[in-house]
């Protein structure tokens, strides 16, 4: 895993996958594949690590081993081997099969506790969730750069943090957004008069996308595959997608109107 630079610098390195590419609208039904036939390690004897602090090495190809520490935020229900992890000093959330990924070396459960945190301003927290925002970051020369995005949810375990994604970089990030709001670095965008809650698609249809495989067509015509792993409660048309060849969690609106 390469360490992305924090704040505005990270966003200047926008991933190739988000550069004017189109997410294929076609959804393929989950197939009974070889993955389903593989023997799975027994989860009954394995400790629940959600909420735990972890450390491990990371070895990819010929690159030197790097050491990582972080907090396990969640276990994905449709793929219990997949965990969402917030690593120390990293702003984005990673999705990794901690017990299966061969690049992960010497996984350890650390004795240190996750610091207890709670939201002091519940009203403000409820106000920003689901809202379009402009998030200000300090640029290279001290200038302020605004990044438009959406606040998705309060993060699990680390309750003072919030999930957020950006138009220019649609992967899952998490920040202490209430602090940013009070410091004037997070602005709620005015809602469009054209939008209406009544325009949402039927929830039953939307729920049916969870667990489905998706195909992503890049600008050069090449494709990558992944799976829809989560639906955003505050914005039911928005989903988390985990691609097979990437440990980032991507965030897309899968039922946008043409």
UniProtKB/Swiss-Prot annotation:
Belongs to the SPIN/STSY family. Residues 50-99 are annotated as: Tudor-like domain 1. GO terms for molecular function: histone H3K4me3 reader activity; methylated histone binding. Interacts with C11orf84/SPINDOC. The gene is SPIN2. PANTHER family: SPINDLIN. It comes from Bos taurus (Bovine). This is Spindlin-2. Signal peptide: none annotated. Residues 138, 246-248 are annotated as: Histone H3K4me3 and H3R8me2a binding. May be involved in the regulation of cell cycle progression. Exhibits H3K4me3-binding activity.
């Amino acid at each position: 895993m390469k360490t992305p630079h924090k704040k505005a610098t990270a966003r200047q390195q926008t991933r190739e996958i988000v550069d004017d590419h189109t997410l294929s609208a076609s959804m393929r039904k989950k197939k009974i594949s070889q993955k389903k036939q593989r023997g799975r390690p027994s989860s009954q004897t394995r400790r629940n690590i959600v909420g735990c602090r972890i450390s491990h090495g990371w070895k990819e190809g010929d690159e030197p081993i790097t050491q990582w520490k972080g907090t396990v935020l969640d276990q994905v229900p449709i793929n219990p081997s997949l965990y969402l992890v917030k690593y120390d000093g990293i702003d984005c959330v990673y999705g990794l099969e901690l017990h299966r990924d061969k690049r992960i070396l010497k996984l350890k459960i650390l004795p240190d506790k996750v610091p207890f945190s709670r939201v002091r301003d519940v009203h403000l927290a409820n106000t920003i969730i689901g809202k379009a925002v402009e998030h200000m970051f300090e640029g290279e020369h001290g200038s302020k750069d605004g990044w438009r995005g959406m606040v998705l949810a309060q993060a699990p375990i680390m309750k003072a943090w919030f999930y957020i994604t950006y138009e220019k970089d649609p992967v899952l990030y998490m920040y202490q957004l209430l602090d940013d709001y009070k410091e004037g670095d997070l602005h709620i965008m005015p809602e469009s008069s054209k939008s209406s809650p009544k325009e949402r698609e039927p929830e039953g249809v939307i729920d049916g996308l969870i667990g489905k495989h998706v195909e992503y067509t890049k600008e050069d015509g090449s494709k990558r595959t992944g799976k829809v792993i989560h639906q955003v409660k505050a914005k039911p048309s928005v989903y988390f997608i985990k691609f097979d060849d990437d440990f980032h969690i991507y965030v897309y609106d899968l039922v946008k109107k043409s």
